[in-house]
Amino acid sequence: MKILHVCSELYPLLKTGGLADVLGALPQAQNQIGLDARVLLPAYPAIIAGIQNTQVVAEFDNFAGHVVLRYGEYNGVGIYLIDAPHLYGREGNPYHDAYYNDYGDNYKRFALLGWVGAELATGLDSWWRAEVVHAHDWHAGLCAAYLFNKGRPAKSVFTIHNLAYQGQFSYHHLYEIGLPTGMFHVEGLELFGQISYLKSGLFYSDASTAVSPTYAEEITTPEFAYGLQGLLSGLKAQGRLVGILNGVDENIWHPNVDQYIPHHYKLKYMAGKKKNKAELQAYFNLPQDESALAFVMVTRLTEQKGVDLLIESADEIVKQGGQLMILGSGAPHFEQGIRELAERYPQNIAVKIGYDEALSHLMVAGGDVILVPSRFEPCGLTQLYGLQYGTLPLVRKTGGLADTVVDSTSESIKARTATGFVFESATPEALRHCLQRAFALWQKPRAWAMVRTDAMEQDFSWRKAAEQYRTLYERL
């Protein structure tokens, strides 16, 4: 079965979030189970730099101007690149300029992505024709609309990685992107008087997926649906919306092969974890104390990620003699808030503003608890990395966090199902209470070791996700 993934990021060449990690791993896992998966994405400078040996598949002019379609390979996966420098030849973030202003021609840049995705199902490459076009997030949302407009030559799947980003543009652009005005309708592309690329993906695809079963439920409610609850609950009722959990790329995120950490370890040989903890404490200039419970947080500093909850309850970690290390960047007031914590408690709390891939790996490997107190979290990858590395996730019960972490209670520890710590309400008090429970378990080294073992034995491999997607494709 020939699968075309249509997306706008690919790890490690270009990444702004978890979407890139998924596309860096899922197609490869699908090929390993016998599917024929390829990827289509814009030829951004970072992508061209990483995929240099390409051949021209097609050259044409359309609503977006002059376009060359190239084909190459990366990590054993076939990659199509849309080479249109007037649209994609911009360094840095693929969606906005250095001042965080969205590019004014995004409607055209991502319409072209969807258009080429549909054309690859109708013979644009005479040697390979997609049977399933699998589009990811709003950037690729128009794929399904173009396929619909061509009489549905292939099956279509749309994956929601984050419903908060919808890709809404003025309806005046409709005639510029080659779609008939009849599709601008509440039973079509229209949302709140604008074209919604995200809604297009949901409405016109044969099936949609969310990146966890709980998130697939949550987005049918007004709180999480951003005005799309009617459409989403309808899809759910028809069996056209399902949740499939993301996996972990074990070539990159596994404590026994991780190229970024100084000391490898595995379930049967954990000595390296203690050594990584000492290295991490040294990096952050915190006391190298093996007995101090070390909390780590690697995150965007936003309200979605629950950073404010942590700022208000972090003194609990200090009070109990623990340590807290944070890596991330984001809203200036949150950056300031965590800097102030580190200044107030220099023996217990340390912060690095920014992003550092190598440090993020050391934090996951060297920490004892990884904090993910998100208000909402479609899937979440950091808690999965924590499980893999025996760094117990402390999470809020939402989205993929609810699907992947089992709270440590006396019953669940005894039943060997506990894998971390879970709190329900998005309040500093609830987080504080959960921190207290983590300290209580830390005082029982044998119980802690049991939970850590059970966490590390969880299977969140991409192979598992690849099998679930195959089952979905086969029933379309």
Curated annotation (Swiss-Prot):
GO terms for cellular component: cytosol. Belongs to the glycosyltransferase 1 family. Bacterial/plant glycogen synthase subfamily. Pathway: Glycan biosynthesis; glycogen biosynthesis. Keywords: Glycogen biosynthesis, Glycosyltransferase, Transferase. Pfam families: Glyco_transf_5, Glycos_transf_1. This is Glycogen synthase. One of its GO terms (biological process) is glycogen biosynthetic process. Its EC number is 2.4.1.21. One of its GO terms (molecular function) is alpha-1,4-glucan glucosyltransferase (ADP-glucose donor) activity. Synthesizes alpha-1,4-glucan chains using ADP-glucose. It catalyses: [(1->4)-alpha-D-glucosyl](n) + ADP-alpha-D-glucose = [(1->4)-alpha-D-glucosyl](n+1) + ADP + H(+). InterPro entries: Glyco_trans_1, GS/SS, Starch_synth_cat_dom. ADP-alpha-D-glucose binds at K15. CDD domains: GT5_Glycogen_synthase_DULL1-like. It comes from Haemophilus influenzae (strain 86-028NP).
